[in-house]
Amino acid sequence: MIILKHLTVEHFRLLREIDLHFPQRGSILFQGPNEAGKSALLESIYFALYGTPIASDHGKSSIDDLVLYGSSRASVTLTLSIGANELIINRVIERGKGQQVTLQVRKLGMPEEEPITRLGTTNERIITELGRVDAETLRNSCFIEQKSLNRLENLPGSERETTLRKLLGLEKLLRLTEQF
């Protein structure tokens, strides 16, 4: 189970500063008027996990668009736990220069690992820790961007099937049945 623990956001989209501690149990509701930052808050979590804007695959958004207007940099730090592992993901965007990332993985009862700072290595490790749920799978299933509720429905059959298999963990099940 993935449990969000803490989120810090600075100069991301329309969010100036957020320091949010999530409850250990229960449901979380983001409520507010239009343009209050609810979607930006969710996109900051998505960005922390995958390092891309939600709309990046559609050519609608670049990474610089995530930096608050008038600011030169944005940062997002997300702490989450997955089983006995805790991940601390920090991503910083420098307008016009791309992003830097640091991933710290802490395993219960194990010595602390060295932080991972290479973008590709970090992204792959996060996807692995998330049970192979990549950005496309999350975006097509349960993390729907505004005005894209029909996204899963409009995918070609084979892509829809692949997305659902990843989401439900059926690929792992198929591999296990082949092994035994």
Q: How should each PLM-predicted stretch be described?
A:
Residues L29-Q31, N140-F180:
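Extended, Lys/Glu-rich alpha-helical coiled-coil stalks
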Residues L41-S44, T102, T121, R125, ...:
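Alpha-helical scaffold elements adjacent to nucleotide-binding pockets in ATP/GTP-utilizing enzyme cores
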